[in-house]
Regions:
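Post-DEXD/H (motif II) to motif III coupling segment of the RecA-like Helicase ATP-binding lobe
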Residues: 37, 102-157
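Conserved helicase ATPase core of P-loop NTP-dependent helicases/translocases
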Residues: 64-66, 71-73, 183, 194-225
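C-terminal helicase lobe
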Residues: 157-174, 258-261, 266-349
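Conserved strand-helix element at the start of the C-terminal RecA-like helicase core
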Residues: 35-50, 126-129, 135, 166-191, ...
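Interdomain hinge/linker at the junction between the two RecA-like core domains of SF2 helicases
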Residues: 4, 8, 68-78, 132-170
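Conserved segment of the helicase C-terminal RecA-like domain
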Residues: 122-136, 216-217, 221, 234-297
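Inter-Walker segment of RecA-like/P-loop motor cores
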Residues: 54-93
Length: 632
């Protein structure tokens, strides 16, 4: 990929612009027109998505997928879809492309993107994709790079404040903490029937399942962190911000206009316009920020991150010094504190490891082990212990099967809360990464399958848990039916349970309908379908009541009159103690039937009190006179 002999006619081009401008489509099309090619994506999710598209176009045998956790490399693969970190550096390709190069300014991963800008070249064509904010710095690095600016295909407009409960369907709400995402999702479930969840902590499989829940129309709302700002092309009309402050690893800070635009740009696709706004008055964006977002005019990047990739493995000190080498441009910031460097520093201080670093090969092995990611982002002693044990085992051969089994199997559980499942997924993803290092294991394919199976199992369980917690399942099923058939079929069973499209939505208790669904627009539509069949049943029940035998009625000590064990009326104060009145339950479904029911009430009701003043008699009424049965 970094060939020494690049054709002098090889072109370098940058395609820059906001989201929804067809940049990735262009790069994929260009790659597949070459005899070989590779694209580096910022997310595993994106690499997988475009891998699947390429497979459809040119066949599975011609396309490879390479990420930290997944490697599918057919023997004669021509086209590679990779995460930027996992691009095979030793290979040469006719076409090379790097997506989202403005991430060179990201404090955590930026140095990787900067390295690819500096060094990744196709022998015939190189295409960089990203935001226009990186243009000035890119042209300083590559003066001969041809730059094309792509305009957004639709408009993005600010519509101000709109409360969460008033958001229209096909809206996304963005927050920047897991508890806040959960709080909003629960509110939307109550008021709107449910929402899908997208967070960076989700595994790709869980995220895809949640996105499908939204895309298929089963729910109309999406609650997300800024994880939706990249790589998720969805049918979103409006993006609402519940906050504009995020924790960037060091401290809370306000989002920049460009960052807001990256997220808001998910609204509207292709030529369909989108909108963005906030959910509270105090969040209103500044006029200048709004103008920048609507016109896609942002301040250019001033700095990007860099770290030396020409490392010296002659000794530990030489390796550390080479990592600390100064950048080639004054607008590049030297990256310090990367996870691999922190792990190297920690492990090399351990005597059990330091004393074993006796060659370039050993030091190189240690450095490769330090690349093992900590997906939990906790950098705990558990992660250091994992790296240390891995190093010790690889020094004497391959990773021990029994040890691998014990490490992987501990995560093969689906009990616990949502956060527990998220933690297990983070841990098993680390093992998915390790098992993809084939030269570290004797039975790599087997262990890859084991780790992937557990990750998939946990991911599916997490999706189910999120759906159970944040989605009214009845709404989901009925919403899908509504989209397919428009008309909903409702029935009442003999036990009073009311079903719409075979989903129980409530029960008819006497003359009262008790719904089980949450409030909201979809619930209202579904309950309307249910209520259409209720008036006839109410009239039937009134007719049955009027001809019922005495045994069908009961009079309780609380004054309630029950018919067939359902409360239908209550005694209320009348003209005197011996002349109470009957008040029929206030049911929205009785209508004219209620008038008929009231006529059976008479003024000459007699209540017999005995002993301690408790009512010992049942009042059973029928026809024109009350009927009293003494219980003695």
């Amino acid at each position: 990929m970094f060939p020494k002999n690049i054709d002098k006619n090889s072109s370098i081009k940058a395609l820059l612009g906001p989201t929804n401008t067809g940049k990735t489509y262009y790069a994929m099309d260009r790659m597949l027109s070459h005899k070989s090619g590779i694209i580096g994506f910022p997310l595993r999710l994106l690499a997988r998505e475009n891998y699947e598209k390429a497979v459809i176009q040119v066949g599975k045998e011609n396309v490879a997928l390479v990420t930290g956790e997944e490697k599918i490399i057919p023997p004669f693969a021509k086209y590679f879809c990779c995460t930027v970190e996992s691009m095979p550096l030793e290979r040469s390709f006719s076409f090379v492309s790097i997506d989202e190069i403005q991430l060179a300014a990201d404090p955590e991963r930026g140095f990787i993107f900067t390295d690819r800008i500096l060094n990744a070249r196709g022998t015939e064509e190189t295409v960089f994709l990203g935001a226009e904010t990186i243009r000035p710095l890119l042209q300083k690095i590559l003066p001969n790079c041809e730059v094309e600016i792509r305009p957004r295909l639709s408009t993005l407009s600010y519509i101000g404040v709109k409360k969460i409960t008033r958001l229209k369907p096909r809206s996304a709400v963005v927050a920047f903490s897991v508890p806040e995402v959960y709080r909003i999702a629960e509110l939307v479930r109550t008021k709107k029937g449910g929402a899908a969840i997208v967070m960076g902590a989700l595994s790709p499989r869980t995220r895809n399942s949640q996105v499908e829940l939204y895309q298929s129309g089963q729910v109309d709302y999406l609650i997300a962190t800024d994880a939706i700002g990249m790589g998720l092309n969805m049918d979103i009309d409006h993006v609402a911000f519940a906050s504009d402050i995020k924790f960037d690893g060091n401290a809370p800070r306000h989002l920049s206009a460009a960052e807001i635009a990256q997220i808001a740009g998910r609204a509207g696709r292709h030529s369909r316009n989108g909108s963005f706004g906030v959910v509270e008055d105090y969040l209103n964006f500044e006029e200048d920020t709004i103008e920048q977002i609507e016109t896609h005019s942002f301040m250019s990047l001033r700095n990007i991150w860099w770290r030396n990739t020409e490392l010296n493995f002659n000794s530990l000190n030489n390796l550390v010094r080479s990592l600390e080498a100064p950048p080639p441009f004054n607008f590049m910031r030297k990256k310090v504190g990367a996870l691999d460097a922190i792990c190297l520093n920690h492990l090399s201080e351990q005597d059990s490891i330091k004393n074993k670093i006796d060659s370039k090969e050993t030091l190189s092995l240690l450095w490769n082990i330090c690349q093992i990611p900590d997906f939990s982002n906790s950098l705990s002693s558990m992660h250091f212990n994992l790296l240390e044990k891995t190093f010790e085992l690889l020094l004497i051969g391959k990773l021990d099967n029994d040890w691998i089994s014990s490490q992987i199997s501990r995560h093969d559980r689906v009990d616990g809360e949502i956060d527990t499942l998220l933690n297990r997924i983070s841990n098993i993803r680390t093992w998915t990464f390790i098992t993809n290092r084939k030269n570290w294991l004797d039975e790599a394919d087997y262990w890859q399958a084991q780790a992937k199976a557990i990750e998939d199992k946990l991911s599916d369980e997490l999706h189910d848990r999120l759906t159970q917690r944040f989605v009214d399942k009845k709404i989901v099923i009925l919403n899908k039916t509504m989209k397919e058939h428009h008309n909903l079929e409702a029935v009442i069973r003999l036990d009073g349970k009311v079903f719409v499209e075979e989903e129980e939505v409530g029960t008819l208790n006497g003359f009262d309908f008790i719904p089980y669904l949450s409030e909201g627009e979809k619930a209202a539509t579904i309950l309307t379908a249910a209520r259409k069949i209720l008036p006839k049943e109410i009239e039937r029940r009134v007719r049955e009541l009027l001809i019922s035998d005495n045994a069908a009625f009961k009079f309780n000590s609380d004054g309630a009159i029950r018919w067939q064990n359902n409360k239908v009326a209550i005694l209320v104060q009348g003209d005197n103690l011996y002349s109470p009145k009957i008040s029929v339950n206030n049911s929205e479904l009785l209508f004219r039937a209620a008038v008929k029911l009231k006529k059976i009430g008479r003024k000459d009701i007699i209540i017999i009190m005995v002993g301690d003043g408790q009512i010992k008699d049942q009042l059973i009424f029928k026809s024109k006179k009350p009927w009293i049965k003494r219980h003695t």
